[in-house]
From Swiss-Prot:
Database matches in CDD domains: IGPD (cd07914)
Catalytic function, reaction form: D-erythro-1-(imidazol-4-yl)glycerol 3-phosphate = 3-(imidazol-4-yl)-2-oxopropyl phosphate + H2O
Protein name: Imidazoleglycerol-phosphate dehydratase
Compartment(s) where it occurs, according to its Swiss-Prot or TrEMBL record: Cytoplasm
Family matches, as Pfam families: IGPD (PF00475)
E.C. number: 4.2.1.19
Keywords (A to Z) from UniProt: Amino-acid biosynthesis, Cytoplasm, Histidine biosynthesis, Lyase
Family: Belongs to the imidazoleglycerol-phosphate dehydratase family.
A GO term for molecular function: imidazoleglycerol-phosphate dehydratase activity
Pathway: Amino-acid biosynthesis; L-histidine biosynthesis; L-histidine from 5-phospho-alpha-D-ribose 1-diphosphate: step 6/9
GO terms of biological process kind: L-histidine biosynthetic process
PROSITE patterns membership: IGP_DEHYDRATASE_1, IGP_DEHYDRATASE_2
Any one GO cellular component localisation term in the record: cytoplasm
Length: 191
């Protein structure tokens, strides 16, 4: 089974995360940031990954450390659950609308970390979630999962734009990690 359980404890955060890439899309998420819980739950549901997250942090400072460290742990868990990546489709893409917003994500689960994101937000925050942390979260996931992500979104409502991005990421990941055979999808023979 493609499962991972990762913990990370620092002076700023304490995070436990479990993921099953062959799950049913169940989510049990508690970070103390309602909008972030909603985004992670949406990601799990639409990727059809089972995801459990327990995260505490120095929210009295701000949400940066908690969101960043959750991205670190999620990225590491994705990498661990994928193992040697033999048989996976490797590439995934999705276009997801949410009312007036449209998000596009294309990714390569190929062992190389990179993020290109085109996203502008109007408000500084959605709930307790700083909109400037959207890009940083995806950078952190990409870096730790060793995946390349190209993402873009447009629209008028920041909630819709961010949610469409998380859902597009979910569908792209679902497609990229799908088992299609036994071989590694690389001319090098390894990822």
């Amino acid at each position: 089974m493609r499962i991972s359980k990762i913990s990370r404890k620092t002076k700023e955060t304490d995070i436990q995360l479990e993921i099953n890439l062959d799950g049913k899309g169940t989510a049990d998420v508690s970070t103390g940031i309602g909008f972030f819980d909603h985004m992670l739950s949406s990601f799990a549901r639409h990727a059809e990954f089972d995801l459990k997250v327990r995260a505490e942090g120095d929210l009295y400072v701000d949400e940066h450390h908690l969101i960043e460290d959750t991205g670190i742990v999620l990225g590491k868990a994705l990498a661990e659950a994928l193992g040697d990546m033999a048989g996976i489709a490797r590439f995934g893409e999705a276009r997801i609308p949410m009312d007036e917003a449209l998000a596009e994500v294309a990714l390569d689960v190929g062992g190389r970390s990179y993020l290109v994101m085109k996203a502008d937000f109007i408000a500084p925050q959605v709930g307790q979630f700083s909109t400037q942390l959207v890009k940083h979260f995806f950078e952190t996931v990409a870096s730790n999962a060793k995946i390349t992500i190209h993402a873009s979104v447009y629209g008028d409502n920041d909630h819709h734009k961010i949610e469409a991005l998380f859902k597009a990421f979910a569908y792209a990941m679902k497609r990229a990690v799908k088992i299609e055979g036994k071989e590694v999808k690389s001319t090098k023979g390894t990822l």
